[in-house]
Amino acid sequence: MKKILYIDMDNVLVDFPSAFERVTETEKIKYRDDMDEIPNIFSKMDPIPNAIESFEILSKHFDTYILSTAPWENPSAWSDKLNWVKTHLGQSAYKRLILSHNKNLNKGEYLIDDRPANGAKDFEGEWIHFSSDRFPDWDSVVRYLVN
């Protein structure tokens, strides 16, 4: 039986700042303190370099799920994240999307996340801190998990 692996979206699979060049100046001013509340912002993001290829590799070795959080104040975020997964990871991946503000409630061996927030630091398995010194990029994560 494959081990369970959860992967966060924002700044792990998805390059959150890449959307800023696709929003209007008016939106930047209006939402300057809450950029994740810009309507449809999550649909404007590019993948992190090597994220898609790494997801495909890891999916062959693990029972892989996408575990992300969406802001309550941005109703489009929930559907935007689903559509992003369908577009970039394919039809089979979207049925593996879990949106939760309590990541620690999920059972599994690994969680790849860039922040300790929303229960990541309390996850019962191993938290792989993406973009840290130990795991600065997808190549380092794949090397660690597959080798």
For each of these PLM feature ranges, what is it?
Residues 75-103:
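Active-site donor-binding segments of glycosyltransferases and PAPS-dependent sulfotransferases
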Residues 14-16, 66, 73-77, 105-107, ...:
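Short catalytic/ligand-binding loop motif for oxyanion handling, primarily in non-cytosolic enzymes
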Residues 1-43, 134:
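Active-site neighborhood of HAD-like aspartate-dependent phosphohydrolases
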